[in-house]
């Protein structure tokens, strides 16, 4: 058939999505980059070793999986132990992450950490982050119109984060973090901050403006019953060629600009965020790299 010949042996983008649900503790959820497990001798908190806590978490995970699969929009399949940690013959997801490769012939490579760069084997890494509300657009949606495949009569809808997903034609990982804290405690902290800003408003107009923003956030949360969460997104791209990496860096910035986000090339936190991105190690995410929002807005940055 002609359409089969058209696609025969044509290059394509190999795309894979993984969703990790990570159980952490209250203290660890607030830790910063200078308190990573890289700096401690014991990496498992005592709260997580409690059997009852682990059982409740697994039950919640199974319920989440069932709800997502029954929705009909997306299908989740749970990874087995062998798929995560690998076997004697095949590498697991963790090995593939450390070598930045999805192939089954993965070879572990040296990791070189420098003040101005990070390298895994011959692969040079560059990182762009969305970790501040000032870098975000004023409005986010679950989907966007893709002009190149849309017409006057029909729309081609893609996810809002598609420009840094399937539409970014280079080797990269797009990470999205949604950190669920105690919502009531978050709102109480914002109430306290608002009072402090009000007290200091006579000394600076910026304090008065900050109080107004905090009040708007609190009003939205209480009026619509929204859950306060923290969010972070980053794009980790790499190349073995130095000149190609420069082009990729520009491409990532351009794709973020298509989402009306402010591209922020991060050269300092690459090792910390790479470490936090290890499958199952999301609890090591540095708290200072996140921004406050609501669940509805946070999931708009998911890539399907």
Language-model regions, residue ranges each:
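P-loop NTPase catalytic phosphate-binding loop
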Residues: 304
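Extended, folded cores of ATP/NTP-driven motor/assembly subunits in large transport
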Residues: 1-301
